[in-house]
Swiss-Prot record:
This is Protein-glutamate methylesterase/protein-glutamine glutaminase. Involved in chemotaxis. Part of a chemotaxis signal transduction system that modulates chemotaxis in response to various stimuli. Catalyzes the demethylation of specific methylglutamate residues introduced into the chemoreceptors (methyl-accepting chemotaxis proteins or MCP) by CheR. Also mediates the irreversible deamidation of specific glutamine residues to glutamic acid. It comes from the Bacteria. The gene is cheB. It catalyses: [protein]-L-glutamate 5-O-methyl ester + H2O = L-glutamyl-[protein] + methanol + H(+); L-glutaminyl-[protein] + H2O = L-glutamyl-[protein] + NH4(+). Keywords: Chemotaxis, Cytoplasm, Hydrolase, Phosphoprotein. The modification 4-aspartylphosphate is found at D55.
Length: 355
């Protein structure tokens, strides 16, 4: 069945390029284009599209205002089209909070060539969006003094324990939901979320303002500390390494792995090699199979692994593949998972195991 797409963008060039890219796919069809949200409102009623692509910054009505109204009145899958700027990344993070499924970045130079290089990725994101489960967003407020789940036992966790997280489509909100429930003395956390360079810094800043723990973009060489989360930068793979008795972050700008840089498989494999039984793996919502092989390696090295269940995923791709490959010990909803991870830690942290 053909997926019907409506393009909303004030740039005639972007409307033309997206139409060409989308219509080249046998299962996708552009049913209309609109230069602004006001025209788009009528077209949505007429054309009944399956997926919208929406420019982040537009005249007449702001893309975020339109998205907020759309999600309140007529929820549907939306893929944001964003500029590779700090402002663009911050607006895109807000769009994900409002309910957008995913986003595509416009190249800074040579837009036509750049967009065509992204054509397969754009098509994949639209397909995933058409199947996405739209999840009602709750308004978020920064965490106050005692928020976060309580730790069982005191002190619960030695600095040897680690939580290793991978996610893709829908992952920005899933990671936020997970981290907001982490107490300030939880183990160190390493995260790979598929996201372009520049956006990971905005993502880390937003999480840092909302969470009880400290959240930062990994720079490489940091000692991994309890109560801290380190997010892979969009330009490099993030790895876990050892430095004497300590765990440290390591960056690698080598080629994509499993079609991605940063890659979840790279992070998970490094955790298998360097943390073994001290690691807890978490695979969240996402398209594709990045992370499935790495999670199996973690399990074989003695880690205990959690996967997000289908009902709470925006896209049940990466968790499904990890479960099918046999690397998952516990499948749970996004709401339940932080508590289950902390329960597991409480039951298994009498003493961290040296590897």
């Amino acid at each position: 069945m053909t997926i019907k797409v409506l393009i909303i963008d004030d740039s005639a060039l972007i409307r033309s390029l997206l139409t060409e890219i989308i219509n080249q796919q046998p299962d996708l069809e552009v049913v209309g284009t609109a230069p602004d949200p006001l025209i788009a409102r009528e077209m949505i009623k007429q054309k009944n599209p399956d997926v919208l692509t929406l420019d982040v910054e537009m005249p007449k009505m702001d893309g975020l205002d339109f998205l907020e109204r759309l999600m309140r009145l007529r929820p549907m899958p939306v893929v944001m089209i964003s500029s590779l700027t700090e402002r663009g990344s911050e607006i895109t993070m807000r769009a994900m909070e409002l309910g957008a499924v995913d986003f595509v970045t416009k190249p800074k130079i040579s837009i036509a060539n750049g967009m065509h290089e992204y054509s397969e990725m754009i098509a994949d994101k639209i397909r995933a969006a058409s199947r996405a489960r739209l999840i009602a967003r709750k308004p978020l407020t920064p965490v106050a003094g005692g928020a976060g789940l309580p730790l069982v036992g005191n002190p619960l966790i030695s600095s040897e324990k680690l939580i290793i997280i991978g996610a893709s489509t829908g992952g920005t909100e899933a990671i936020k939901s997970f981290l907001m429930q982490m107490p300030s003395d939880c183990p160190g956390i390493l995260i790979t979320q598929h996201m372009p360079a520049g956006f990971t810094q905005s993502f880390a800043n937003r999480l840092n303002a909302l969470c009880k723990i400290s959240v930062q973009e990994a720079k490489g060489g940091e000692r991994v500390l309890p109560g801290h989360a380190y997010i892979a930068p969009g330009h490099s793979h993030l790895l876990l390494a050892r430095s004497g008795a300590n765990y440290v972050t390591q960056l690698d700008d080598g080629p994509p792995v499993s079609r991605h840089r940063p890659s979840v498989d790279v992070l998970f494999s490094s955790a298998a090699n360097n943390a073994g039984k001290n690691a807890i793996g978490v695979i969240l919502t996402g398209m594709g199979k990045d992370g499935a092989e790495g999670m199996l390696k973690m399990k074989q090295a003695g880690a205990y692994n959690f996967a997000q269940d289908e009902a709470s995923c925006v896209v049940f791709g990466m968790p499904k593949e990890a479960i099918a490959m046999g690397g998952v010990d516990d499948v749970s909803s996004l709401n339940d998972m932080p508590g289950r991870v902390l329960q597991y830690l409480a039951a298994n942290s009498g003493r961290a195991l040296r590897v």
